[in-house]
Amino acid sequence: MLNEQNIRLIFGLKLRQLRQKKQMLPKQLAKAAGISQSYLNEIEKGKKYPQPQKIVSLASVLGVSYDEMVSLKLDKQLSPIIDLLQSNALQDLPLETFGIGTDKLVELIANAPAKVSAFISTLIDISRNYEMKVEQFYLTALRSYQQMHDNYFEEIEESVQLFMKEYQENLGVDFDFSLESLQNVLLEKYRYKIDKKRLSEYPELRSVRSLFVKKRRKNVLLLNDNLNAIQQKFQLGKEIGYQYMKLKERNMGPSWMQASSFEQTLNNFKASYFAGALLINREPLISDLKALFKKSKWNGEAFLQMMKSYQVSPETFMHRITSVLPRFFGLNQLFFLRFTNTQKNDEYVITKELHLPKPHNPHGNQLNEHYCRRWITINILKELALKQKENKKAGPIVRVQRSLYIDSGNEYFCISIARAMYPTPNKNSSVTIGFLMNKDFKNKVRFWNDSNIAVRMVNETCERCRLTDCQERVVEA
């Protein structure tokens, strides 16, 4: 079923094609039909649908009947567009986010309709053949969006600074990043009700951190009562982000629940970015990182203490670093990986990744291959599991490694933190930032050649590795 927008698109494409067949310029057709050239441009771009009398005038000038002009039937050249529009494929592509306006798309389709529609349909078919769910498609698009901006978003940073300024002006005190202050903002400014008991009544939701319930009089935030203070602060900061930036389209549950549009996925990211930027303010972090990079020796304990000083989770801390480094340090050749692992299990899964500015050697694999067991991000999970046998509350732990890729020759300096995935039982996660060890990195990070840091030959997966004497190999190549 074609909606109004698609009908406008079809009419505009048909009008443009008929005009070109008559070898008329837009200015000539507009004058002959008694309409302005700007109005004609709006019609051809699919933004406007003309009144009946205007259609009569256009049809007369172009030498076609009124019925032919308004018919949704297209000639052979343009017919693939109908299939494309009816498939809703364009709705699955977040084109506007990437600066591809409807007018540009219409122009592309009009110039090569069969090729463009076939290309877009192929993208959709590939995603279906690989059983890529719609939300996975949205997440892939989101990663591309982050890469375009080096994972730094000035407009959100400015929103955070403005929020803190308004807080200080209204209350006469600086925002102190405490759990109580975050709760009070939601309770008093945005009239929320925060319920920490409801989720515990449903065992199947014990791993869900929060749910948003929109009500006419008062929004309700259901918080998992098993969350620690650090996790609660992030969820509250995220809710403030939604409200302060007026992000209306949202997924009511956690990010892994199915999103019905790319805008929901994007807004979830924006709210999370806001929370990270609020809890880890930009200027103190830049100062801390400058001091860290000046040291000639790596100090893991000092790195953990830096993280703890912000009272945030390892993932929030490491992800925030990936936002600051490209913009303020010029270190934009990096990757971020999050692995999860069930205790007493040798299966390791990448659940989040980001590559700046392009894919690096360690990356997700959809073929169920076995990731290289020499990666620090996997070894640190093994180490944490061993520590948890002695102490269930062990962690977080931090480790570093220089990883030299056998085939590409690329070398990465990797910093990894592992912790228990509280409140999810019996699961651990590790987050890793890997820096391409180019001249720029070595000039800015003094401890890159600390002799105490291990250098290991690594590869991507066991199945693709040519090493024959690898003790860590879990399957044959």
What are these regions (language model features)?
Residues 1-21:
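A short, Lys/Arg-rich alpha-helix, primarily the initiator
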Residues 9-10, 17, 27, 31, ...:
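Short juxta-domain linker segments that transition from a proline/glycine-rich
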Residues 24:
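Glycine-rich phosphate/oxyanion-binding loops and their immediately adjacent helices
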